[in-house]
A protein has these predicted regions:
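N-terminal intrinsically disordered/low-complexity leader segments
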Residues: 1-9, 191
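Hydrophobic alpha-helical connector segments
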Residues: 59-62, 70-101, 146-153
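Helix-loop "lid/cap" segments that line or gate small-molecule binding pockets
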Residues: 89-96, 103-114, 183
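Amphipathic alpha-helical packing segments from all-alpha helical-bundle domains
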Residues: 66, 73-75, 97-106, 116-141, ...
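Helix-turn-helix
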Residues: 13, 17-55, 59
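Hydrophobic/aromatic-rich alpha-helical bundle segments in the mid-to-C-terminal region
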Residues: 118-123, 127, 139-191
Length: 191
């Protein structure tokens, strides 16, 4: 009897392997051979699921973004203020998973400058994230311009995250969280 393969599961495994290789070696250093080896598969298997490296990179970015987005639904039982804090905290590179996500996002942001599909993926992710934050902020008392506040918070988190990526010793998780809380407090968004 032929073996049944879950195509989406296999593609997800390959994308996770690609993310790990990109985190170690960068986009240019992430060869199809290295990604296949990281996943424990052959390049022939990889080619069966992705026509080329660009397709794999786009899928890898989308998968990373979808994992982050899926975490938002886990916060539906929290108050808007608590969900906002949890969402922003979970976006910071305070653990291996979010650090890899940020490395992939930043690495592929450079490629997105000349690749309209990658640019669209990045743009759509930010629009979705902004919309989610606006929804939370709109339901919080005292927030008069939710869209402006959402943009400010995205800038705050992105700034902290980039500093933490480039200077992990200087920006350990504790410092990232203090900076986040200071930014929220400045806007009177924490209790």
């Amino acid at each position: 009897m032929p073996k049944i393969v879950d195509v989406e599961q296999r593609r997800s495994e390959l994308a996770e392997a690609a993310a790990r290789v990109i985190a170690r070696a960068g986009v240019d250093g992430a060869s199809m051979r290295d990604i296949a080896a990281e996943a424990g598969w052959t390049t022939g298997t990889l080619a069966h699921y992705f026509a080329n490296k660009r397709e794999l990179l786009d899928f890898t970015l989308r998968a990373s973004i979808e994992r982050r987005s899926a975490q938002r639904s886990e916060r539906s039982d929290l108050s808007p203020a608590d969900a906002l804090r949890a969402t922003l905290e979970s976006a910071l590179p305070t653990d291996d998973d979010t650090r890899v996500h940020w490395i992939v996002t930043v690495a592929l942001a450079g490629a997105a400058a000349s690749d309209t599909d990658l640019a669209a993926t990045q743009r759509d992710a930010y629009r979705d994230y902004r919309g989610y934050l606006i929804g939370l902020l709109s339901s919080m008392p005292g927030i008069h311009e939710p869209a402006t506040e959402a943009e400010r918070l995205i800038g705050l988190v992105d700034g902290i995250a980039l500093q933490a990526l480039f200077d992990p010793e200087g920006w350990p998780p504790e410092r990232q969280l203090r900076a986040l809380d200071a930014g929220l407090l400045a806007a009177s968004m924490v209790r």
